[in-house]
Amino acid sequence: MIWPVYYALARGLFSRYPLPPGSMIHLDIEEKNNRCRLLDLAAEHGPVFKAIAWSELWVCIVGLTRCTRFINENKQRIRPVTIDVTRLYAKGFLRQMIGEEHRHYRKPLVVALRDEKVSSLLPQLRPIVDRVLADYARRQSVTEPPLPETLLAALSEISSRQLIRIIFGSPDQSAFSERLFAGYRDLGPHGLVWNQGPRQERAFTALRRMILDEVRDAPGEAGGAVRRLHAMGAFDETMLGHAIMMVEMGRYDLQGFFRWLLRYAGQNPAIIDRIALENETEPAEGNSLARSFVLETFRMDQSERLIRRAEQDIVFDGWLIPRHTKIRLCLWESHKAADHFPEPFAFHPERFRAGDRPADQFSPFGLDEHYCPLAEIAMMLGTLFVRAVAQRYRIESIADGTPLRGAYHWEPSARFTVLLHPRDGHDA
């Protein structure tokens, strides 16, 4: 244990309020071996409990209503925690900004990413999925199934090319798009840029330079959030950093989410057959089966937690949360509430057919003003991906083992991959 833990224990001794219940177990280790460990601890100690993780004191809060109330009651006492990218650009991720600075950058970005602007690009985004998956299917062999790395590379290419088109506006496979695609491979060839060194600094600088040159040389060219931000007068060095890192983090998250979609597609062929025959237009009321499939996948996986740090001592529900404590707002566990989702560990997309759930039941993209600005884009791309797969292929899962805790998210088994069998009338 390091000094923040000793500080917390000392504060607990001298405060009129006790620390939350819970033993000093190493939660980061125990959770890797039991994904339901936090649910077990909440059942034992109640919805607010403490533990040790990564040599720090953590307080976990389960239940979306409770998590939202904690944020609203303590906005001035907590700060979002995320990957530190200030080595790449000074002010860092949008998600770690607070107050007026956060509002200053978030508002124009949300306007630039409005649904109708992105939905108009869907006819250009679908061919990316079709082309990359067709190439993947052509190169597969029944006797030698594709390596997991081959599937990851294909999904990374899809997510990267789609987000480059949405954020930077250049048509896929254009000269500028190809330079950006290569630049992102240099920035994070093996996934999310977690630790930045000289190589990442050089790659980030190269991306920054080519984007600035393109915006300067073709400022009025149609399409892309960056050009809309430039036209609004909201494009500065920090916004450029946000744009670059939104693609970097987004392509990593989408690649992982596409893997989950394929896993559930392989496990539920009858549902995929129904999606293949479904009208692509969303119904006037409720959700299509494809969109419901995406929502249920977010409920089951990938939407896991929000993390905050206590900037000062906090008293919440009678418990002391000392300064420096990390607070984990447990989304994955909250989405397993049986009173809202009967059979919470079963995959049932039908539960979303009547429509999206209210935020006190289901909130995969955040709980406050830091709600993910790419939320509806992720939904659009997930739905597009499911439809593309369902309409053209039957999915055979290979090595669909126990999920594991990855560097940032839970992931399907490291050996998981798929065979794509073309449906009648569709060539690989």
Task: Briefly describe each language-model feature range.
Residues 26-40, 44-46, 282-319:
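Conserved cytochrome P450 K-helix E-x-x-R motif and the immediately C-terminal K′/meander segment
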Residues 251-278, 375-393:
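Cytochrome P450 catalytic-core helices
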Residues 353-414:
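Cytochrome P450 heme-thiolate "Cys pocket" and heme-binding signature region
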Residues 1-86, 361:
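N-terminal membrane-proximal hinge/A-helix region immediately C-terminal to the signal-anchor transmembrane segment
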Residues 2-10, 79-83, 91-126, 171-179, ...:
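Cytochrome P450
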Residues 330-356, 365:
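Conserved cytochrome P450 K-helix/beta-meander segment immediately N-terminal to the heme-binding cysteine loop
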Residues 118-256:
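Cytochrome P450 heme-thiolate monooxygenase catalytic core
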Residues 322-323:
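Residue-level recognition of short, solvent-exposed, well-ordered loop/turn junctions
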